[in-house]
């Protein structure tokens, strides 16, 4: 099948952006079902790209290749995997990793595909019709490149519904992952729940931020909000914090957080785990006059679509205002947003407004983004989704 773009709508493809939106389509020639590979042409019939067809999505096609002679088959996926692996090998050596993002979707030339490696388990998320259509070719390539690895599917994410796909989960090849699998980063051991954890089991993207937290933690009383399985708490303890309190609404993840502290043979008496709503707990702490020297604010995604951006801004401002009010002068706030729809400059403005409402001046002393195994290809700036700031309270 061939998809012709409306006149003038080829500009983004000429700049090698990997998405084609439904509004850019002039006409379709031939028949193709969801996920099949189609050719993209401009209004004059000039070939531009080869892409996966997603008729039920606003993103009607996602580009596999801009090379006309490149066939989308198992060997294509082998080449992409080898390109990605060479960078991860260097990172793993530098940072002491046996867990990392192997494929970061569009930024690794594989739109709609996420692959995380935890020891000898490869965890897949296939997020688009094209990715699902190529499942067999991708799995074949993974078996060829990683014969020592088991493959587990965590395509149980709601974004698949936008592509007309069912949610899937389970072992694809090899062994079932254990209930908890330890990985290492920067000398820390951290447990991963591949089967039931958030995303593919762990937030690999915050690795650099955890190292920063460790470097700031010395002698500080730390509040770790939205703690999940306590990786920031382990980092703070390894950085010789005075105390770290981890807060989450899930008791099961707090139990793993405690296990992570024990796994690293750290002082459990310096760690506290509280099951509570972060917003409410911060208000309670303010009323009680509690004070901290460092607060880590790493909430879940507040923005799923553009219509939620205004309410998300209010949520980010409120929670960061409360955090700033709980920090002593000289205290450090590490605050993050993991939503791609939240621009970095807007998030920085929200933090500035939160400080104003809190009645404090803050200094921006460091800026964060997702770790380097989550690269952002220059032609797809949307790949930058995680942003954060270290702020010092004056």
Curated annotation (Swiss-Prot):
Keyword tRNA-binding: no
Domain PUA: 1-79
Cellular compartments per GO CC: cytoplasm
Keywords per UniProt: Cytoplasm, Methyltransferase, RNA-binding, rRNA processing, S-adenosyl-L-methionine, Transferase
Xref: PROSITE patterns: PUA
Location in the cell: Cytoplasm
Catalysed reaction equations from the record: cytidine(1962) in 23S rRNA + S-adenosyl-L-methionine = 5-methylcytidine(1962) in 23S rRNA + S-adenosyl-L-homocysteine + H(+)
SUPFAM superfamilies: PUA domain-like, S-adenosyl-L-methionine-dependent methyltransferases
Predominant cellular place of this UniProt entry's protein: cytoplasm
EC number(s) given by UniProt: 2.1.1.191
GO molecular function, one term: RNA binding
Catalytic EC class: transferase
Cited Pfam families: Methyltrans_SAM, PUA_3
Annotated function: Specifically methylates the cytosine at position 1962 (m5C1962) of 23S rRNA.
NCBIfam families (UniProt xref): PRK15128.1
Family under the similarity heading: Belongs to the methyltransferase superfamily. RlmI family.
Name of the protein described by the UniProt record: Ribosomal RNA large subunit methyltransferase I
Record organism: Yersinia enterocolitica serotype O:8 / biotype 1B (strain NCTC 13174 / 8081)
Gene name tied to this protein: rlmI
